[in-house]
C-alpha cells in the first residue's frame, strides 16, 4: 500500500515527466497564462530560435498591468512604454496563434480573475504565469505559481518546466468568522502570524472549517497572497463548492466529460496521515478586520489595535526595519488605527476585484457619500465582473456615493499605469502589497478588505465595520 500523500504530492506526482538524481524534475504544465509585462522577451526568444508555441490551446494571453482604467482608453493608450508592451502582446499572440483578450474585449481583465472566469483554471492542473500572484488559481486545487521570463519562454516552447519539489506546509483555520470578517482578513492574519518568510521553501495547503466555508472568490483571495507569506504556491482541496463554480464556465468540461472530471477531482485531497513539514493553526473566531500599518504585508494589526512600538522587537535588524517602515508611513507608535486618516481608496486587483468584493463594498457605500478630500476608485477585475456589477446596479451605488467607476485592469495595485499615488498620499487598498513605492513614489499603502476600504472612503479614516454604520 502506498504512503499517504498530500494534495500537493498528488498533483506533483501526476505531472512529473522526468526526475534527476538530485531531485530536479521536468514538470508538465497544463495551463499557461501570459500578460504584457513578462512575455515580450520570451516570445522574441522563440522568434529568434525559429520555434513555435508547443500548445497554443493551453496558453491564454491577457493585457492587464499597463492598460489604463479610464473610460477614454478606447481612444488608445497615451503612455508610450505601456502602449508598446500592449501592442507587442497583441502581435505576439497573433504571430504564435495564442488566444488573446485585448482591452477592447469584454472578457479582458486581470489575468488571475480571467482564468477562473473562463474555466481555463480547473482542479488538479499545473498552472503558471510570469506573475507571482499566479498562486490565486490554487483555490481550485491546482498547483499554480509564478515563473520568470526565461521560464515563460521554456513553457511556451516545451509545455514543461524544470522544478525542484518544495516542502509541504499546512495552514489550518478552524471555527466561524465573525460578521464583517472576510477572506482578506484571514490571509492577512496568516501572514501576520507566519511572517513574509514563513512559507519560504513550502507549498501551503489551506484547510479547516473556516476555509471550507469560503466561496470560491474568498478562496482565491486567500491563495492569492500565498507569495506574500513566502510560499510560491498555495492550494485548497476542491469540493462541491469548487465543482459548482466551474461547471458552467466556457472552457470547463461538459456532460459526461464533466462527470469523469469530477470523479477525478474528488481524489484531490490530502490523505489521512499525510506528512506536512510544517503546520500552522489559527482560530477564525479570534480574527477581526485587519489593517496593515507598515511597508510589509506582515505588518498587520486588527483595526481595534494601535500602531505597534518597534522597540518591543528583540531582533535589532528587524527592529530597525520596522522603525524605517513607520518613518516611511508617517506614523507613530501608539496611534489608534481608527485615527489614521486616508487620502485615497483603491478597491480592485487580483486579490479583491471580483463581484463578491464589489458587493461587500457596495453594502458599505449604499446611501452614503465619500468623505471630503478622499479620492476613491472602484476597478472591476474584468469586463465580465463590470457587466455583472452594472446589471446589479452596484455602479450606481458607487457613483452616487462619489466613487470613481473604472474599466478593468491591474490599476493602482502597482504604479505601472496611470493610476498611482502622489508622494505622501495615504491609501486604503484592497491589493496585496504595501511595499515602499508600490502604488506610486512615496505613496503609503494600507492593505484592507473591500468592505473596510469602502467604509474608510466614507468615514475618511479607518473604522471597525462591525460597529460602524
From Swiss-Prot:
Heterodimer of LeuC and LeuD. It comes from Brucella anthropi (strain ATCC 49188 / DSM 6882 / CCUG 24695 / JCM 21032 / LMG 3331 / NBRC 15819 / NCTC 12168 / Alc 37). Binds 1 [4Fe-4S] cluster per subunit. The keyword Hydrolase does not apply. GO terms for molecular function: 3-isopropylmalate dehydratase activity; 4 iron, 4 sulfur cluster binding; metal ion binding. Keywords: 4Fe-4S, Amino-acid biosynthesis, Branched-chain amino acid biosynthesis, Iron, Iron-sulfur, Leucine biosynthesis, Lyase, Metal-binding. InterPro entries: 3-IsopropMal_deHydase_lsu (IPR004430), Acnase/IPM_dHydase_lsu_aba_1/3 (IPR015931), Acoase/IPM_deHydtase_lsu_aba (IPR001030), Aconitase_4Fe-4S_BS (IPR018136), Aconitase_4Fe-4S_dom (IPR036008), IPM_dehydratase_rel_enz (IPR050067), IPMI_cat (IPR033941). GO terms for biological process: L-leucine biosynthetic process. It catalyses: (2R,3S)-3-isopropylmalate = (2S)-2-isopropylmalate. Disulfide bonds: none annotated. The keyword ATP-binding does not apply. Pathway: Amino-acid biosynthesis; L-leucine biosynthesis; L-leucine from 3-methyl-2-oxobutanoate: step 2/4. Belongs to the aconitase/IPM isomerase family. LeuC type 1 subfamily. Its cofactor is [4Fe-4S] cluster. PROSITE patterns: ACONITASE_1, ACONITASE_2. Pfam families: Aconitase (PF00330). Catalyzes the isomerization between 2-isopropylmalate and 3-isopropylmalate, via the formation of 2-isopropylmaleate. Its EC number is 4.2.1.33. [4Fe-4S] cluster binds at residues 350, 410, 413. It comes from the Bacteria. This is 3-isopropylmalate dehydratase large subunit.
Amino acid at each position: 500500500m502506498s504512503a499517504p500523500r498530500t494534495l500537493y504530492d498528488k498533483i506533483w506526482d501526476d505531472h512529473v515527466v522526468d526526475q534527476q538524481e538530485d531531485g530536479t524534475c521536468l514538470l508538465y504544465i497544463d495551463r499557461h497564462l501570459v500578460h504584457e509585462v513578462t512575455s515580450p522577451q520570451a516570445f522574441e526568444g522563440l522568434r529568434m530560435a525559429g520555434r513555435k508555441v508547443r500548445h497554443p490551446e493551453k496558453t491564454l494571453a491577457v493585457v492587464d498591468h499597463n492598460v489604463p482604467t479610464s473610460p477614454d482608453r478606447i481612444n488608445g493608450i497615451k503612455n508610450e512604454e505601456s502602449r508598446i508592451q500592449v501592442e507587442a502582446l497583441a502581435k505576439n499572440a497573433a504571430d504564435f496563434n495564442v488566444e488573446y483578450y485585448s482591452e477592447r474585449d469584454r472578457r479582458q481583465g486581470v489575468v488571475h480573475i480571467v482564468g477562473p472566469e473562463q474555466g481555463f483554471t480547473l482542479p488538479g492542473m499545473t498552472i503558471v504565469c510570469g506573475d507571482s500572484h499566479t498562486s490565486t488559481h490554487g483555490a481550485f486545487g491546482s498547483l499554480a505559481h509564478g515563473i520568470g521570463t526565461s521560464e515563460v519562454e521554456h513553457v511556451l516552447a516545451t509545455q514543461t518546466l524544470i522544478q525542484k519539489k518544495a516542502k509541504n506546509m499546512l495552514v489550518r483555520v478552524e471555527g466561524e468568522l465573525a460578521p464583517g470578517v472576510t477572506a482578506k482578513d484571514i490571509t492577512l492574519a496568516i501572514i501576520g502570524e507566519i511572517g513574509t518568510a514563513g512559507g519560504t521553501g513550502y507549498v501551503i495547503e489551506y484547510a479547516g472549517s473556516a476555509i471550507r466555508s469560503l466561496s470560491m472568490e474568498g478562496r482565491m483571495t486567500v491563495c492569492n497572497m500565498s507569495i506574500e507569506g513566502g510560499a510560491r504556491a498555495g492550494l485548497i482541496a476542491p469540493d462541491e463548492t469548487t465543482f459548482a463554480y466551474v461547471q458552467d464556465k466556457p472552457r470547463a468540461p461538459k456532460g459526461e466529460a464533466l462527470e469523469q472530471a469530477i470523479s477525478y477531482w474528488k481524489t484531490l485531497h490530502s490523505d489521512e496521515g499525510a506528512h506536512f513539514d510544517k503546520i500552522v493553526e489559527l482560530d477564525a473566531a479570534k480574527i477581526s478586520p485587519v489593517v496593515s500599518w507598515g511597508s510589509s504585508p506582515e505588518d498587520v494589526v486588527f483595526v481595534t489595535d494601535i500602531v505597534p512600538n518597534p522597540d518591543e522587537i528583540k531582533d535589532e535588524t528587524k527592529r530597525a526595519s520596522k522603525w524605517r517602515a513607520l518613518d516611511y508611513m508617517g506614523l507613530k507608535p501608539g496611534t489608534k488605527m481608527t485615527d489614521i486618516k486616508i487620502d485615497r481608496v483603491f478597491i480592485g486587483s487580483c486579490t479583491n476585484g471580483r463581484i463578491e468584493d464589489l458587493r461587500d463594498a457596495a453594502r458599505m457605500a449604499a446611501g452614503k457619500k465619500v468623505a471630503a478630500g478622499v479620492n476613491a476608485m472602484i476597478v472591476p477585475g474584468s469586463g465580465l465582473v463590470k457587466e455583472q456589477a452594472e446589471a446589479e446596479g452596484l455602479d450606481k451605488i458607487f457613483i452616487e456615493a462619489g466613487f470613481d467607476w473604472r474599466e478593468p485592469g491591474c490599476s493602482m495595485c502597482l504604479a505601472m499605469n496611470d493610476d498611482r499615488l502622489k508622494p505622501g498620499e495615504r491609501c486604503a487598498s484592497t491589493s496585496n502589497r504595501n511595499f515602499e513605492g508600490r502604488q506610486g513614489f512615496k505613496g503609503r499603502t494600507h492593505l484592507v478588505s473591500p468592505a473596510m476600504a469602502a467604509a474608510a472612503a466614507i468615514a475618511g479614516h479607518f473604522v471597525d465595520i462591525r460597529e460602524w454604520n
